[in-house]
C-alpha cells in the first residue's frame, strides 16, 4: 500500500510504502525530515484481503470497520489499530499475543477472531460481524433497559468473562 503526501516545507509530492508510516524520511527536494503519515483508510480500501465498506465505530484502541473478506465473501468487523501503535514493535507484539489468546476462545457470547496481520504497516484484526445496534445506541434510543433485559445481558457478559478468565 502506497502513501502519497507533500513536504510541509517545499510542497514536493512524496510517495512511499505504508510500511514506513510513522517513520522519518528526508524530502528528496529540500531534505527536510518528514514523518510519513498513516495510510488513509476509506471506503473501498483493501487491507490484508479485506475490502473496507464503512466505519462502524471509533475508540481509544482504534477504529472498527465493516469489511468484506474477499477470499470467503463474508462480512467481518475489521479492527485497525492507531498508527502510533503500528510502528511500536512492543505494542505490535502485545497485540499479536492478545490475538492468539482471543483465537483460542470459543464461546457463544464472544465474537470469534478470524484473522490478524499487518499490511502496509497497518495492524488489523478481523472478527465475526454481529449485525445490530450497539448497547449505547439502544440506550440512547429507548432509555434505560428494562430490568429483565439488563439482567439477561449481565448474565451473558458474566458467562463470557468467566469463560475467558478460565482460559
Put a short name on every predicted segment.
Residues 2-167:
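Conserved ATP-binding/catalytic core of the eukaryotic-like protein kinase fold
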